[in-house]
């Protein structure tokens, strides 16, 4: 049922996007006041202006249709792209189910996605301008990866990886290391180097995570937990970075760096390890406390109703 599917995806992807950006819209002036944002451009600082009521309302309405966003909610591009990808795929599959086979559809869709991805990557023509305007720079690359996943589900790919764990682990690890020196992927802005580079990086990255997960129950549990609570990470990822920046500025005071540095103080030193860990752990901790509090309040309500 396509309608039910759309409703389900709206609840799990669209609604979190709107609520997260609503939170950062409401708190924008407060964050400006305490220095998390700044009106002045500086070292790694993207200036933010105060919001009046009309500007805030306009921003909220824009977020309802996936337009715009907030600086600290930058990671929510993933929710927007995944929603559009899954809905487009579901609708097209439904409309074409009696016209062409699914294999034919996947092949055509992959060709279109690959062309679109390369055009966006190279900033070619009106397609690049259009996707930038509506904030879907990552759509074609994400759709391409989504289709790869659909294909792999129909193969014995996972079984092959299980049977050749060590060789696949070494291949994926060394391969990703070499690719890191060749180019980089910035999916949020549609930069993928080229189609082959993106496809190979995606496959090798998946193999590495899969092998590590199946050989460690603890890591598998962690990956599963992170996956089930990823909305908290997407929502609070960049805000959590401010914890690291704040501690760094206490230890190493620098006049040319402020708390408003975005997304991080420096990108090319070991601080990225702290940013990565805090950017995941802090949101998960907030989510854990929230769910515990919600469960407690719910149990108290049930207790009062039964008293």
Residue ranges and their predicted role:
Residues 1-307:
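Alpha-helical transmembrane segments and their immediate juxtamembrane cytosolic regions
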